[in-house]
């Protein structure tokens, strides 16, 4: 059964023209991981939230599994992971199964030129050293050493 939660000024019906007091249209955005077949939110923006500048080839972050049935004990030197400029390229997967992927990363730069969305999984980032700001629809979230950053699946963000 559908559950509705109203926050702020919204139209009486969904998916209709909705204008502010000056007659300007609000932009409607559907936020969901499975479209209308799942739980979703309709968000209304004063300004258009996105503008597609270009569509690039899909970027896979799926790990390459070197030893699919490996049960050997291992010791990892996480603070010695090689630093790389790009956030996505810097992620090195250590362990993976059908439910979870554990990676280490040492990005040198922030994601200034792009936003990223993981459409298939939630992300949890533990910050061992450093800090920054995550920009998303939820606002700007500052993080620092010792923080966990939880990013729900389908969230468009920039670090």
Give residue spans per PLM region.
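An N-terminus-focused feature that recognizes amino-terminal "leader" regions
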Residues: 1-158
């Amino acid at each position: 059964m559908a559950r509705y939660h109203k926050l702020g000024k919204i139209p009486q019906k969904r998916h209709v023209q909705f204008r502010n007091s000056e007659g300007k249209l609000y932009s409607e955005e559907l936020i969901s991981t499975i479209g209308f077949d799942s739980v979703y939110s309709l968000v209304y923006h004063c300004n258009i939230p996105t503008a597609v500048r270009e569509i690039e080839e899909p970027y896979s972050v799926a790990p390459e599994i070197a030893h699919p049935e490996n049960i050997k004990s291992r010791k990892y030197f996480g603070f010695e992971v090689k630093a790389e400029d790009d956030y996505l390229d810097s992620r090195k997967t250590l362990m993976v199964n059908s439910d979870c992927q554990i990676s280490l990363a040492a990005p040198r730069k922030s994601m200034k030129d792009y936003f990223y969305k993981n459409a298939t999984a939630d992300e949890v980032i533990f910050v061992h050293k450093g800090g920054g700001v995550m920009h998303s629809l939820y606002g700007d979230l500052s993080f620092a050493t010792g923080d966990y950053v939880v990013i729900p699946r389908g969230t468009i963000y920039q670090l």
